[in-house]
Amino acid sequence: MKIASQNADRALLLVIDVQRDISPGGRLAIAEGDAVVPAINQLAGSFQHVVLTQDWHPANHTSFASQHPGKQPFDQIELGYGPQTLWPDHCVQNSPGAEFHPGLSPELLARTELILRKGFRPGIDSYSAFLENDKQTTTGLADYLRERGFQRIFIAGLAYDYCVRYSAVDAARAGFETWVIQDACRSVGPASSEDAATRAIEQIGVNRITTADLL
């Protein structure tokens, strides 16, 4: 029996930030970021329930290097809530770059029960689908999932070393059985960043699997 088919009504596919700006040709392009799209589309038939997250930044978002004179994308700074990586302007609200990747299948979108927009507060970033970067402000997703009886979360999307990593860690901390679908993710940073993400999710007990384990 495939993993996702066990208690299928309590299993959820969580797709992180598969958007135009985070795909090749976008403002925060991830190399081979669009390679996750076919894998995620394949998974649609294995899940009854899907949630998509969407980076949704105001134009003056504090995570943008353009808001900090003298700083460049990928510089590190300290903000009131802790360290922050600065990014190119990306996924600005209502811009074409904030749209979902056009290759996501109609079947996947038809099964989507919630689109969770994150990073919309100007003064704080939100890598995780569950908590803002201050680790205190909740997105409400954990309560939404608990109220509907979900227990098992399978995560795919972009970027593995940031938003997937922090979403997986926070899902596990919130008490959900959590899997990351490795071949349906890509990283934005170097190999060292990907390795750090893998260590972080494994240390908290998140499982790493592939699409073959689910199809």
Where is each model-derived feature located?
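Active-site flanking residues adjacent to catalytic metal/cofactor-binding acidic residues
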Residues: 16, 54, 182
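Residues at the starts of beta-strands that form the adenosine-phosphate
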Residues: 10, 48-49, 112, 152, ...
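Short acidic-hydrophobic, aromatic-tinged amphipathic segments that line or gate anion-handling sites
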Residues: 205-215
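Short, flexible loop segments at boundaries between secondary-structure elements
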Residues: 180-194
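Histidine-anchored nucleotide/phosphate-binding helix
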Residues: 39-43, 164-175
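Short glycine-enriched, charge-decorated loop/helix-capping segments at active-site entrances
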Residues: 26-33, 129-133
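Active-site alpha/beta core segments
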Residues: 38-148
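Extreme N-terminal starter segment of soluble prokaryotic enzymes
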Residues: 7-13
